[in-house]
Amino acid sequence: MLGKTQADQGAAVIRAERLGKTYAEGKMRTPVFDGLDLSVATGETVAIVGASGAGKSTLLHLLGGLDIPTSGEVYVAGRRMSALSDGERGKLRNRSLGFVYQFHHLLPEFTALENVMMPVLLSGQDVSIARGQALQLLESVGLGHRVEHKPSELSGGERQRCAVARALVNKPGCVLGDEPTGNLDDKTAGTVFELMLELNRAQRTSLVLVTHDRSLARRLDRVLELHQGKLRELAPSAV
């Protein structure tokens, strides 16, 4: 296991054991990594860094149940993902995880409010509850005055703040971010990053962020480097 601050099995919001992924095309086999162990505690913030093509996004997809590992297990909120049906995995993701990507993936035909309401509606809550939770989150990310605007009417930073609100609206145990500030200018990226840290502190939501920005990575609790198929924790001086 990695890191002195890492949670024990009972307290982990996400846990991976001996995780491996190999891509197959015909007779060709391309191993990405094998035997990775990782545990993320409640409220902990973790950066994953590494060279392009190292498998960082693949690891994030496996942790989020968006892809199936070749070997090993992923546990989310104590539940083994491989033991769940596709439908059960989808419900667990919606309830326990939030996702923020480099590109916002907002639905263009819906307003900011409707986009943020969507995860709550998918969890089975009624419209009034979904609207209330979405309005509260949009206000907290500084978009209370833009709730009726569609993504095309928002700036890049506003769209990403809306995506952060959508990721957090169901109060997930962990948010997984794949270069969430990578498509923004430095000033806007800093604003969005600060927002994610503020919400992490306020809600005790864990963060696992893939980033190429070492200056941002240094501000998280732990920095893990994926290198040649192995995951290692970096000392602060090495980040």
Curated annotation (Swiss-Prot):
Membrane topology: Peripheral membrane protein
EC number: 7.6.2.-
Keyword annotations of the record: ATP-binding, Cell inner membrane, Cell membrane, Membrane, Nucleotide-binding, Translocase, Transport
Subcellular localization(s) per the UniProt record: Cell inner membrane
Binding site residues for ATP: G50, A51, S52, G53, A54, G55, K56, S57
Keyword Zinc attributed: no
The keyword Transit peptide belongs to this UniProt entry's keyword annotation: no
InterPro entries in UniProt: AAA+_ATPase (IPR003593), ABC_transporter-like_ATP-bd (IPR003439), ABC_transpr_LolD-like (IPR015854), LolD_lipo_ATP-bd (IPR011924), MacB-like_ATP-bd (IPR017911), P-loop_NTPase (IPR027417)
GO molecular function, one term: ATP binding
Enzyme class per UniProt: translocase
GO biological process, one term: protein localization to outer membrane
Cellular component annotations (GO), alphabetically ordered: plasma membrane
Domain ABC transporter, chain residue ranges per copy: 14-239
NCBIfam families: LolD_lipo_ex
Family label: Belongs to the ABC transporter superfamily. Lipoprotein translocase (TC 3.A.1.125) family.
Function of the molecule: Part of the ABC transporter complex LolCDE involved in the translocation of mature outer membrane-directed lipoproteins, from the inner membrane to the periplasmic chaperone, LolA. Responsible for the formation of the LolA-lipoprotein complex in an ATP-dependent manner.
Subunit record text: The complex is composed of two ATP-binding proteins (LolD) and two transmembrane proteins (LolC and LolE).
Name this polypeptide is given: Lipoprotein-releasing system ATP-binding protein LolD
Gene: lolD
